[in-house]
Amino acid sequence: DVFNNPANYPNYIMISAHRGYWKDYPENSLPAIQAAIDLGADMIEFDITKSDDDVLYLLHDYGLDRLTTGHGIVRKGEGATFEYYKSWDELKNLKLKEVTGEASEYKLATLREALSMCKNKVLVSIDKAENVIPQMYYLVKSLGMVEQVTFKTKIQFFPTPESIKQLVKNTEDQRQLVKMFTPTVYSELMDKDPDLISKMKAFIDAGCEGFEMIYFQDSDPMLTRQVTIEGQTYTNILNWLKAKNTRVIQFPMWPETEKGCWVPRKFKYSIINLKGTDRRCDWDWLLKTSHAPDLIISDRLEILFDYLQTIGKRTL
């Protein structure tokens, strides 16, 4: 109920563990997931991909080198179109790397293993599933976890409820899949997509329960631009979502970094060039924006827990 009805819990901000608790264990590993559960995370977020023989497993990168003792790429593509490489037999005995880069004792986890670990304990958010949604969904359904699992991807990839519904066959599965979907919306779309609000409204009307809203600074149109929807004017798009009792999700980076621009282990994401303009890591700023997020995705759970408890935002 906390996830589905954020308006009923104004003093409780949910915490999602980004790739588990990878401060002490390899990211997207089973022990990282268990550690996050033990710390009290409300949700675990992890990334999935698949082998060329259709085994779904946890891995963020396109290649093996940064995170495992293996080498080479495992997927290639863009948007919701990918090619996959390496069989599960080639992958299952690789060792995951610690944050230091050294090999650990842990192996890649299958999605089935990760979901089974989370079942009846914690909510789940699955990232990078856009090319494997039907397979992911039917596995979640077979485990009896459709009310416990969400998945997310950019709204550009699936801009309408119908684009999600067409991935599965029967009406009930279609309804449930839309309910599980968390569209990710970047602030720049406020200018680039004139139909953005109508698309978001269509998802809400179809049962979608939350959006990951990516805004970086005070001047972002998500914070500054009034919106008028069905004759009602709102301060900004976030306040409209709040009025609709729809969850707002944000992902700030580590709080001790400069303007959110710290990059772990010198691994550079070439598609991101923030240039000191990202204020999401400043939690004081984030929670004082016109509508503070109802759920924060974090790499540093222990710090965020303490912070939210101190300001009275972990009270049910």
List PLM regions with ranges.
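Phosphate-group recognition and catalysis centered on beta-loop-alpha active-site segments
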Residues: 1-316
